């Protein structure tokens, strides 16, 4: 049996996925079953766009349920070590881009809970890969997608 990929995540991320799964199973799935039932009542299924749309939606919901169940089954909860001197998954890192003094902060999380719009970056991102394992006041080179790089200085870890 091959090794199954684990999904590192914070406890908060795990709980968020559990809520999402519950919503899919108890709200979204029954809603789409009802849509299918109503669409069937329209008669001929061969030319019934409402039925086709509802079946497609059902497929997406079932895929999401399977994906989330898989991630939860193979979740690796990253415990907070309490060490705010080293960057690790679950920590929020504040840094300044050098030269300069404008601060940016991101929480490093597992890919399953990454949400850049809310300041959560995946541990698999170039930024996080460059920061993980580094310490307070370290200067770090971060590769950019265009082949360049930026230099940042870590000013806070929490």
From Swiss-Prot:
Keywords: Coiled coil, DNA-binding, Transcription, Transcription regulation. GO terms for molecular function: DNA binding; RNA polymerase binding. It comes from the Bacteria. PROSITE patterns: GREAB_1. GO terms for biological process: DNA-templated transcription elongation; regulation of DNA-templated transcription elongation. Residues 2-70 form a coiled coil. Necessary for efficient RNA polymerase transcription elongation past template-encoded arresting sites. The arresting sites in DNA have the property of trapping a certain fraction of elongating RNA polymerases that pass through, resulting in locked ternary complexes. Cleavage of the nascent transcript by cleavage factors such as GreA or GreB allows the resumption of elongation from the new 3'terminus. GreA releases sequences of 2 to 3 nucleotides. Belongs to the GreA/GreB family. This is Transcription elongation factor GreA. It comes from Staphylococcus haemolyticus (strain JCSC1435). The gene is greA.
